[in-house]
Amino acid sequence: MKTFLVCALEPSANLHLKEVLKAYKKDFGEFELHGIYDESLCKEFDLNSKPLYSSHEFSAMGFIEVLPLIFKAKKAIKELANLSFTQKINGILCIDSPAFNIPFAKALKKAGSKIPRIYYILPQVWAWKKGRIPIIESHFDILASILPFDNQFFNKSTYIGHPLLDEIKEFKNQEDINHTFSKKDDEKTIAFLPGSRRSEIRRLMPIFKELSQKFKGKKILCVPSFNLEKLEVYGDISEFKIESNTPKVLKKADFAFICSGTATLEAALVGTPFVLAYKAKAIDIFIAKLFVKLKHIGLANIFCDFAGKEALNPEFLQDKVNVLNLYEAYNKYDYKAFFAKVDFLKEYLQFGSAKNLAKILNEI
């Protein structure tokens, strides 16, 4: 039985890790984990060990909000590096979170660790900080990419497919689409996804609540499961139906308003027309504009940009995020163009990410 040290700091990283572990267990049998991950995985996979740190301790977004975690991250890196020598570890899997995983890989190399290191979900060097490329390539043995264009930037990356195509179990078909078009406005289900972090929710929910008054049909507020006991941050949500399974919410929704993040790509792949709305601290936006050189911030639109396609969905940022703009975008939505690009995205990204990564883990 193999033992892996994993670093999955974000909620999305743990969702991806869960699918990888399912694929590994199905194809190769039992395993053990050490590192940073969601405690729920211990029960689900009947693990004997517990995480050194819970992933919830490291969740943050923005240049300012991450600062308090720096000292904790340094402590965790030191402890994880020591753990790699005191436990029999077959492989180290780092998922996303470059601000943590790159320093961790450096610490491992400096300590003389010979354990194979895999980086899954590579840093977005195509957006900013391309100078990280040689550092990443020299500190990781395998670069498991989920983006078809990563190989334009990394010399030794291997594209293994996009994890969302494995994780989403139901996609809209033509019958679903026709059913949406046959509905009157007061029969439509509208989903609101204001993000998972407290700061995102506080900025978007007042606008989403006011916007929801424009719709007479069913209104769903998608709340991540780990936020279900913290509903006070959303304010008065009595007019919404609360659900937490994002793909299922998107499957039943006729339209969605979504904070920037993984959910925008989920909506595109499921086939739910949506508008992206994002508000951040002014200082975060200022810093981002200095370094990030992209036309769009939504993942689906970024993929379309790299493929030479027009944007898939409208995006509204900062002061442009208001009820008037969002409702107008809903009323003027180009559904035909949206669905055409959805088909392209599925073909572009491919399936099989979890199974392919499980195979890599078994071979190291």
UniProtKB/Swiss-Prot annotation:
GO terms for cellular component: membrane. Keywords: Glycosyltransferase, Lipid A biosynthesis, Lipid biosynthesis, Lipid metabolism, Transferase. Disulfide bonds: none annotated. Pfam families: LpxB. It is an enzyme of class 2 (transferase). Its EC number is 2.4.1.182. It catalyses: a lipid X + a UDP-2-N,3-O-bis[(3R)-3-hydroxyacyl]-alpha-D-glucosamine = a lipid A disaccharide + UDP + H(+). InterPro entries: Glyco_trans_19. One of its GO terms (molecular function) is phospholipid binding. GO terms for biological process: lipid A biosynthetic process. Pathway: Bacterial outer membrane biogenesis; LPS lipid A biosynthesis. Condensation of UDP-2,3-diacylglucosamine and 2,3-diacylglucosamine-1-phosphate to form lipid A disaccharide, a precursor of lipid A, a phosphorylated glycolipid that anchors the lipopolysaccharide to the outer membrane of the cell. Belongs to the LpxB family. This is Lipid-A-disaccharide synthase.
